[in-house]
Amino acid sequence: NNDPSGVHFNPAGTKMFILSQSPDTGDFSHVSEYNLSTPFDVSTKTYAGNGERCILDNGEDDVGPTSWMHDLKFSHNGMMLFVGRGNAGSDNANGDRVFRFDLTSPYDISTCNFPVGSAVHATSNLDDDDLQDGSNAGTVTVPHTKNRLRGFDFSNDGKRLFVLFGGAGSNHYSRLLEYQLSISYDLSTISIVTDAGIRLQDSGSDDTPVGNAKGLDFSPDGKKLWVVDHGGGIYDRDITQISLDVAFSTSSYTIDGTVELPVTGDGNAGLQPSGLTFSTSGLKMYTTNDEDEDILEYNLVCPFNIISGRCPAITDN
């Protein structure tokens, strides 16, 4: 994979899917599949082969999934694959989008299909004012050319889409925006939720400790979310955990805390951690590292929790 920027598993943990940030050949990026002989153990992976890849060809080499791809998710039933794009240039107007590919059987990405010209299968330009401004996450006061989509996730019913923007340059900052889809997983029905959203970075404030956000994931019950970043200084290679008062609603939340990713055996904490996901049990967490092109696996002592003192009682699980 070229610069892995997203990771996901099937529910059984026997398949791992990796998104390449940029194409190795041709015009479009791709998603690769690996088989795991031991569920959720990435050390047991074997490459499924080029024939099992999903080439992200939507027929548009100008605003399609060609490069700067970030994050991948599946619909709750595994019949839809989603990928995000967010350019890294100084002017990425019309660059931030989410794309949907349909599958003929659950988690079989070799069958991925994008009907050319279908509005259902791609968001409109997420850099438009009406999809960026007016929420609790704040309004960017300069032209929307440096928002930089870096992650996304859906509610279980497919009617909420959460998009993580890393931001770049003066007056741009990391934000999590919440969108409503009036039809489940229909990306053409998108609208911003103005009474929700989280501003994740605010001039180095300890209350919003996320700089250069790079990945997003929600717990299955929608009551927690995590953001990975690899900014500089105090923002270096961290994961922030946020609890939501209402499932899959960012209108009211608590920042539980932030942990620095531990150093691995070779002394590298993952210079460029980006994609983020968990095992079905919540006892393993995974990040991609697009600097060294590998996947890092972490064991957790509490399901879907990385902050000391925030593990729920057994009866709550």
Where in the sequence are the language-model features?
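Surface-exposed loop and turn segments in beta-propeller and other repeat-based domains
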Residues: 1, 46-64, 113-144, 191-208, ...
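Blade-level signature of beta-propeller repeat domains, shared across WD40, Kelch, NHL, RCC1
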Residues: 275-310
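Residue-level marker for isolated small/hydroxyl-bearing positions within beta-strands
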Residues: 19, 84-86, 164-166, 228, ...
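Short glycine/acidic-enriched loop and turn motifs that connect beta-strands
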Residues: 22-27, 87-93, 167-173, 231-236, ...
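Residue-level detector of Asp-centered blade-edge/turn motifs that repeat once per structural unit
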Residues: 11-12, 76-77, 156-157, 220-221, ...
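Signature of short aromatic-glycine-proline-rich micro-motifs recurring in repeat-based ectodomains
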Residues: 1-8, 63-73, 137-153, 207-217, ...
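Short loop/turn segments immediately following beta-strands, especially the blade-tip
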Residues: 33-45, 100-112, 178-190, 241-252, ...
